């Protein structure tokens, strides 16, 4: 298994200890949109603070979406996600309620 930078990951990672609580990672996925424009292609970047305008809707009006995902390693060594299509549906419903552009399912599946 490799990171987004192509570095080999530590194979001793204890996948069975993962929970549905916050699990800090080395990277995070970032994507953006403005107004009614479609979502831009996302990217993996090192985990850390994100730059944000003081006028951001999430700060002024509480308009924001977040969806976490859980991954598992199979007995054959593959990494699989736990119901990513459900994550996509929840985020699409949330975007609709907040009058934001829907997040494409491909963000979660591809």
Give residue ranges: language-model regions:
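Conserved alpha/beta cores of soluble small-molecule-handling proteins
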Residues: 1-110
């Amino acid at each position: 298994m490799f990171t987004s930078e192509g570095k080999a990951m530590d194979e001793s990672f204890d996948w069975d200890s993962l929970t549905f609580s916050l699990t800090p990672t080395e990277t995070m996925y970032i994507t953006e949109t403005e107004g009614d424009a479609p979502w831009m292609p996302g990217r993996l970047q090192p985990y850390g603070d994100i730059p944000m305008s003081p006028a951001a809707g999430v700060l002024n009006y509480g308009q924001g979406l977040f969806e976490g995902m859980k991954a598992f390693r199979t007995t054959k060594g593959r990494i699989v996600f736990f119901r990513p299509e459900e994550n996509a549906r929840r985020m699409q419903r949330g975007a609709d309620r907040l009058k934001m552009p829907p997040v494409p399912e491909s963000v979660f599946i591809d």
